[in-house]
Structures are given as C-alpha cells and as structure tokens.
Amino acid sequence: MWFRSFAFVCFLMPAALPAQLEGVIDLHVHSAPDSGPRSITAVEAARIAVRYKMRALLLKNHYTHTASLAYTVSEVVPGIELYGAIALNRSVGGINPTAVEHMARTTGGLGRVVWMPTFDSEHSHRTANPNPLFVSVAKDGKLLPEVLQVLDVMASHGLSLATGHSSPAESLLLIEAAKARGIDRIVVTHPQPDPVAMDIETQKKAAAMGALLEYKFNSTLAPNSAWPSEFVSMSDTLKSIRAVGPENVVVSSDLGQPGNPIHADGLFAFIQALKSAGFTESEINTMMRINPAKFLGLK
C-alpha cells in the first residue's frame, strides 16, 4: 500500500523528515495513556516531534481531558509545545460546562480546545455506531441550552471549538452560535468520513462562515474491520482540500492506533501527497503551520 511505502521511506531518509516537518503542528494526536489501545505514549510522541523539529501537538482523548497530560509531558520533554483538550462524551458528563471550566483552569493553562461529542454523539448513534446512551447537542434545529452554556464558558476562557462527530446541520449551528459569542477559532472535525459525512457544498458553507476544516491522514488508510466507513481515498481528500481552499484547511494525522503509522510518518506522507497533487509550499505551510497555530491561539 502507498501509505506503508511512505512510512518505510521515512526510515530510509531520516534527514528528510526534520526538513519537511519543522514547525508543523498536529491537531489530532492519540497516545497512551488511554482506555483503549495506542501504539505510542504521549512522551514518545513528544520526543519524536522534538526530533523532527515540530512546533506543537494537540493531545486528544475521547473520554478524559488532556490538559493535565499536556502539562506533565511538557515537564518531561522540553522543546515542543503540548496542548490539551476535552471531548464532551458521557465519561465527562456529556455537555458539561463544569468539566470545560475545570479543563480550562488546569495547571499550566494548556487546555485549549473543546470537542463536541465524538463517539457518543447522537449523529454517530443514528448514522454509524449505534449507542443508545448518546449525547445530543441540538433538538428541533436548535442547540440545547447546555450547549450554549458550554460556549459561554469557552468564550470566557478563550477556548477553541472543534465540532466533533456532530451532523453537518449541527456543525453549522455550532459555528453560528460560537461566532455570535466571539469564538473565532473553530474547526469542523474531519468532515469527509462517517460519521460526519459533510458534503462538499456544506464544507464550503462552513468555511464561508469562518470555520477551518480538518482533513486527516488516518481516513486515507485502507479500510479496516472496525471502522470501514471512515475510509476516504487520498485522491478524494486532496480534491476536497482544493475545493474548500487551503486557506480554510488544517491537516492533521489522527494517528496513534496499533498497526497504523506514527504521527510524524503520517504527516510526512500527507506532505508528499500534497506536493504530488500540485499544492505549493506556501499552501502546505498554511494548512500545517499557520492555520493550526491560529486555531490554538498561538502567534
């Protein structure tokens, strides 16, 4: 498979990775400790990022906030900026303003992002992964009051919004409500694959409303038995990026699963695919350095 050969190239040409990945920010990093299997620890991911001169990693966990982990690993591994987030799944109380408040107040101030529900989202339950204990964000075309409360807490702490596994319609509602509260740093979480499955016209609309759209390497890997509907070919991914416009895009890995490439290898392979498709160095810089930095509130 092409992605395996790219990972192999990364081992054959170690000098190429620092040059390609210097200053890159990955906004979707899975790692251990976690309640599910991971191929790499957060400490290992940070050390590899330092080796390749990356700027920052955003640590993601579907079931607990990662601001504490980001702070602890930062104490152990200098030379890399690490940030944490919270995903509003059932394990943190679902749409829970108090959980967001505590994440924002965690030592170090490294909690930067709130994901709306992911694996526990109502949209995921109805379209991809049945889960009767789902977490709703909207009813009858309107965001729930507790979602608006979360957005208010986010605005007061200067946090960034990721739409999680919300439906396309819910994502647009979230963007509109967030912008109304002065939350300008918004990412539509991997809009292409299930369970989000946002069509290209809606992706363009989200961009026009002021959101960035995330395209991830993980989805381009060969479909597996656990998540076959998440597969989106690299060709289709590149077409969507071009249609939406690199100025409206962030590129991430969403890696850390056993059997998949590690984060740096996936990003390196994504860069090679972008270059092969005619994307310029300036466009790649925008998608992998400038826009991710803006989303995290970095200068």
Q: What do these predicted regions represent?
A:
Residues L17-I80:
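An N-terminally biased module of ancient metal coordination in phosphate/nucleic-acid-related enzymes
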Residues A32-D34, T64-S68, N89-V92, S121-S124, ...:
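Active-site environment of divalent metal-dependent phosphoester hydrolases
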Residues L27-G36, F119-K142:
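Glycine-rich phosphate-binding "P-loop"
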Residues R4-A16:
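Bacterial N-terminal signal peptides
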Residues A264-K299:
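Mid-to-C-terminal alpha-helical segments outside catalytic/metal-binding sites
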Residues K216, P246-H263:
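Short acidic/histidine-rich active-site segments
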Residues A42-V50, A67-T72, P78, T98-V113, ...:
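Histidine/acidic residue-rich metal-binding segments in metalloenzymes
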Residues G23-V29, L57-L59, Y83-I86, R112-M116, ...:
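Hydrophobic faces of well-ordered beta-strands that scaffold small-molecule active sites
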